[in-house]
Swiss-Prot record:
Entry GO terms, CC: cytosol
InterPro entries associated with the record: Phosphatase_YcdX_put, PHP_dom, PHP_phosphatase, Pol/His_phosphatase_N, Pol/histidinol_Pase-like
Residues holding Zn(2+) 1: 7, 9, 73, 192
Cofactor(s) in the UniProt record: Zn(2+)
An example molecular function term from Gene Ontology annotations: zinc ion binding
Record protein name field: Probable phosphatase YcdX
Matching CDD domains: PHP_HisPPase_Ycdx_like
Organism: Salmonella heidelberg (strain SL476)
Length: 245
């Protein structure tokens, strides 16, 4: 099990069922040292208001030895790579994930999807691209992986893609992992939990990584220190409380 989980949703995204406190309790139970709350960006129908993300600044950094990152799963809005995260939201957030979601950006052809994803990667605003192996959004995998490595953006392997959502992702995700390996980039693992019970579950992700002999030292989740070094290299100020992790 990895001690870091980078993708989950709370009751603020109303199709999810757990609170911040629920995740903290489950993290303590499972030995998760650091996690990121990444509720859906405000352009989704049941997403929280942008004030929700701005007000994350009131959260404690550390609760009972568990570190909490303030994040968002933003929506890629168009082929220019614009996302539904802006202004003061950036000032409060540590981690920006962005991906395709049908209510905001309908599936297009491979060329258009690739253009939108690369523009998002190149924007400098995003740390991780969520579920890039979604079969509803075909992309040029090699081009995406090379762009991500160039711009120091991680591509996600999403455990939920193999269980509850985005069925048929396995082949695409193996291709993503292999392309990231060859490009010398990073992968991020996300449980994409919508309930705290699945926090830290990367069982299916591990199968994908093993299938392509993915190097362990290019997985952001291997330790809090690895993930924090990545974020700090992208401009996040060091968080003194996280020195205890």
């Amino acid at each position: 099990m990895y001690p870091v989980d980078l993708h989950m949703h709370t009751v603020a995204s109303t199709h999810a069922y757990s609170t911040l406190s629920d995740y903290i309790a489950e993290a303590k139970r499972k030995g998760i040292k650091l996690f990121a709350i990444t509720d859906h960006g405000p352009d989704m129908e049941d997403a929280p208001h942008h004030w929700h993300f701005i007000n994350m600044r009131i959260w404690p950094r550390l609760v009972d030895g568990v570190g909490i990152l303030r994040g968002i799963e933003a929506n890629i809005k168009n082929i220019n790579g614009e996302i539904d995260c802006s202004g003061k939201m950036f000032d409060s957030l540590d981690l920006i994930i962005a991906g395709f979601h049908e209510p905001v950006f309908a599936p297009h052809d491979k060329e258009t999807n690739t253009q939108a994803m690369i523009a998002t990667i190149a924007s400098g605003k995003v740390h991780i691209i969520s579920h890039p192996g979604n079969p509803k959004y075909p992309v040029e995998v090699k081009a995406i992986a090379q762009a991500a490595a160039k711009h120091h953006v991680a591509l996600e392997i999403n455990n939920s893609s193999f269980l509850h959502s985005r069925k048929g992702s396995e082949d695409n995700c193996r291709a993503v992992a292999a392309a990231v390996r060859d490009a010398g980039g990073w992968v991020a693992l996300g449980s994409d939990s919508h309930t705290a019970f699945t926090l830290g579950d990367f069982t299916e992700c591990r199968k994908i990584l093993d299938a392509v002999n993915f190097p362990e030292d290019r997985i952001l989740n291997v330790s809090p220190q690895c993930l924090l070094a990545f974020l700090e290299s992208r401009g996040m100020a060091p968080v003194p409380e996280f020195a205890e992790l």
